[in-house]
From Swiss-Prot:
This is Large ribosomal subunit protein bL20. Gene3D superfamilies: 6.10.160.10, Ribosomal protein L20. It comes from Synechococcus sp. (strain JA-2-3B'a(2-13)). PROSITE patterns: RIBOSOMAL_L20 (PS00937). One of its GO terms (molecular function) is rRNA binding.
């Protein structure tokens, strides 16, 4: 007896069209274009979940660098001073501190500067 694929194919197409909901034009209406768009979107999502970690680290370093240069210290000198002072704040916390509480960040910079001098 021949196996007809009606139910299986319909479920597969409905699943893809559901994932493509909100895409523009034929990307959400026609199965073939929707399938291509969904595959591309899933690839981009996978890639960008990994890229996001790099991008945020770059942003934090840029913010820390700007804040430390305003205090007369370069980024690499600041990080070296933190390591020597045994201050274990990660870059995310340092960037938040520089952005939200500049006075506290100034104290951290001074501690790093003093540990570098000694």
């Amino acid at each position: 007896m021949r196996v007809k694929r009606g139910n299986v194919a319909r479920k597969r197409r409905k699943k893809i069209l559901k994932l493509a909901k909100g895409f523009r034009g034929a990307g959400s209406k026609l199965f073939r274009t929707a399938n291509q768009q969904v595959m591309k979107a899933l690839r981009s999502a996978y890639r960008d979940r990994r890229r996001k970690k790099r991008d945020f680290r770059r942003l934090w370093i840029t913010r820390i660098n700007a804040a430390t240069r305003a205090q007369g210290l370069r980024y690499h000198e600041f990080i070296d001073g933190l390591k020597k002072a045994n201050i274990q704040l990660n870059r995310k916390m340092l960037a938040r501190l520089a952005f939200l509480d500049p006075e506290a960040f100034t104290q951290v910079v001074e501690a790093a500067r003093q540990s570098r001098a000694s």
